[in-house]
From Swiss-Prot:
The keyword Transcription regulation does not apply. InterPro entries: Cyt_c-like_dom_sf (IPR036909). This is Cytochrome c-555. It is a peripheral membrane protein. It is found in: Cell membrane. The keyword Ribosomal protein does not apply. It comes from the Bacteria.
Length: 50
């Protein structure tokens, strides 16, 4: 679960120009669902912010 969260978080930052995520989870997998991915990323960031 932690690896999945870290990967989503990584790709979330990638959407804003951040570094790419790990190669084990290519951004292409999320093509067409960036909005959902962004929501998940923001949710994860919210948890880590607290």
């Amino acid at each position: 679960a932690l690896e999945a969260s870290g990967c989503l978080n990584c790709h979330g930052t990638d959407l804003t120009g951040x570094p790419a995520x790990p190669a084990t989870m290519p951004p292409g997998m999320f093509k067409g669902s960036n909005q959902q991915l962004k929501a998940l990323s923001e949710f994860i960031h919210g948890l880590s912010a607290k």
